[in-house]
Amino acid sequence: MSIEVLGISGSPIENSNTDRLIRAMLEATERESEFVKLSRITVRPCFACKRCIPDNVCKVRDDFPELAEKIKEARALIIGAYTPYKQIDGFTKALLERFWSLRHVNNLLRGKLCATVLTYLTPDAADHVNQSLATELEQMERMELVGQLMVKGNLTCLTCGVGDECEMSGIKRRYGPEARSCDVPYSRVEDQQEVWEKAMRIGRLIGQRLRTMDRN
């Protein structure tokens, strides 16, 4: 069966909050879906070679052309990212750059449904990244953005093994001079009730919209 909803995660952490929420949203759509983790494949940044202009096919030799076929086939995308250094992660940034190859003349993403998941530590930075995502997907790719989710993530220093001793650790800076990694609870997306419920609503909405399109 063809892919109707494609979930793409830019989180490199195995079974991360981002991954689990995307998978749950895919299930909530009740449509044929597939999950892709960008850290398991190779999608390099755009080389600005412009060789994609005549046929909307990227000529960079990595895994994007194969992924692009799935993206073109899908009727809806759920894109997950996170915000290291208060910016969008490199995996997702490279993917968004490569969307450029699909835009020329034919605008192959136009009209597709889309939702985003963003895992963050700093709310202000996340707001800025969310705004940038909305601008690219709606205004540049002409997709229909049906929802955006923000998930509270976890400080990397909590699980690196040296976070309590490292001079550069963010634990004390963020949680106080006496804080230790064992004092900070792990943030699970399943425990963020409002976020989880909103995600399920968005997933169901995508499924409903696709069913409505089928009837028309």
Question: Model-flagged regions — what are they?
Answer:
Residues 59-144:
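Helix-loop-strand module that forms the ligand-binding subsite of alpha/beta enzymes
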Residues 9-11, 18-21, 76-91, 185-205:
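Short Fe-S-cluster ligation motifs
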Residues 144-216:
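Glycine-rich phosphate/pyrophosphate-binding loop and the adjoining helix
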Residues 9, 37, 149-150:
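Residue-level recognition of beta-strand->loop/alpha-helix junctions
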Residues 2-31:
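N-terminal beta1-alpha1 ligand-phosphate binding loop
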Residues 53-69, 165-174:
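Iron-sulfur (Fe-S) cluster-binding segments and ferredoxin-like electron-carrier domains
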Residues 38-58, 156-164:
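N-terminal beta-loop-helix "entrance" segment that forms/cooperates
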Residues 29-34, 142-144:
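A generic structural motif
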